């Protein structure tokens, strides 16, 4: 007779529970892998003219000077929050928490959003240095500069959504003839200010990407000014090398930054067309955009390769740096043409 205090199926129950746990773990892993592939997709480029036209039709707006640039800024910011997987940088759950490529892409996009939002608030929307700033832009720009990695209280997405709402309100007023205090001034001096920001961003990205291989650099920080000084000592020659763990981070940051910049420059081509044509600089801007578009080509390897210069394997970072450097050289020439041409 079997003793009921020691059932014979106790081991089977434990085995069944372990088996169930194993299948649950495998299913969880499989679902997260699928989500990783889904989240890891970068948004496609969009047509800024179509976006502006569609937004104007949906909200009953008129496409006036500055409408395309502002609508493009809105679309890029909205895409940042609502692309596949949403905004990933501040996620604390898998698979997002173990992904770093798309969060770095998001950061690159965010930097460009912040730069254009700042220029829109301080320059594009103001006629003179003594003029009043727009209230909606005054509310929107600081919210875009909120911590990009805040999960709660308040979370990043909530702040950026508020920034988008304020920016949309500015756009509504901009296209309303009865709202004369909302303006966008497409002037050469305003565009020069923005291009100077772009120069620095692209120059910094190019330097970080070029450091994917060991580089000996001369310290040129004080060159061109015999009376210049700096806070602390730096050697006259520097050896620069990006950590292996940051190679793909820098690459995807640059890819996100150039993705956003392509759209912003396309929009500027529309709103500043008269200024650019007067300076005979429209073709120069289009060539810059074409150089940046090359940075968005498909990547055909499962990881970012980091070959050594002319070595056997490709070096994706150096290729990206080449495109960005050429675009930056074009930006510098365009800015000088607008200043002196």
List each language-model region with its residue ranges.
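N-terminal Lys/Arg-rich, disordered targeting/topogenic segments
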Residues: 1-16
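Hydrophobic membrane-insertion alpha-helices, especially the h-region
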Residues: 22-36
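A cross-kingdom marker for long, charged
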Residues: 44, 48-54, 249-252, 258-341
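N-terminal Sec/ER secretory leader and immediately downstream segment
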Residues: 50-159
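Long, amphipathic, charge-rich alpha-helical segments that form helical bundles/coiled-coils
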Residues: 136-174, 284-309
């Amino acid at each position: 007779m079997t003793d009921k205090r020691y059932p014979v199926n106790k081991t089977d129950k434990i085995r069944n529970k372990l088996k169930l746990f194993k299948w649950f773990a495998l299913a969880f892993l499989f679902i997260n892998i699928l989500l990783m592939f889904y989240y890891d997709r970068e948004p496609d480029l969009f047509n800024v003219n179509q976006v502006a036209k569609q937004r104007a039709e949906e909200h009953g707006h008129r496409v006036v000077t500055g409408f395309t640039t502002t609508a493009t800024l809105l679309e890029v910011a909205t895409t940042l929050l609502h692309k596949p997987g949403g905004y990933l940088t501040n996620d604390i759950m898998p698979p997002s928490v173990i992904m770093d490529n798309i969060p770095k892409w998001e950061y690159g996009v965010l930097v460009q959003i912040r730069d254009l939002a700042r220029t829109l608030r301080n320059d594009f929307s103001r006629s003179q240095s003594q003029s009043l700033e727009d209230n909606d832009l005054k509310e929107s720009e600081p919210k875009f500069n909120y911590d990009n990695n805040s999960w709660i209280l308040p979370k990043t997405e909530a702040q950026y959504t508020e920034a988008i709402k304020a920016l949309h309100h500015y756009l509504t007023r901009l296209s309303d003839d009865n709202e004369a205090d909302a303006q966008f001034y497409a002037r050469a001096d305003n565009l020069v200010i923005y291009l100077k920001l772009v120069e620095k961003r692209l120059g910094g990205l190019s330097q970080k990407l070029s450091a994917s291989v060991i580089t000996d650099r001369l310290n040129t920080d004080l060159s061109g000014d015999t009376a210049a000084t700096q806070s602390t000592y730096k050697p006259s020659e520097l050896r620069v090398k990006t950590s292996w763990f940051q190679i793909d981070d820098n690459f995807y940051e640059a890819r996100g930054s150039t993705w956003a910049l392509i759209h912003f420059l396309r929009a500027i081509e529309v709103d500043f067309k008269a200024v650019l044509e007067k300076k005979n600089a429209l073709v120069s801007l289009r060539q810059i955009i074409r150089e940046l578009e090359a940075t968005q080509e498909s990547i055909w390897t499962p990881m970012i390769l980091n070959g050594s210069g002319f070595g056997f394997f490709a070096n994706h970072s150096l290729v990206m740096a080449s495109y960005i450097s050429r675009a930056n050289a074009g930006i510098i020439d365009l800015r000088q043409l607008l200043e002196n041409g």
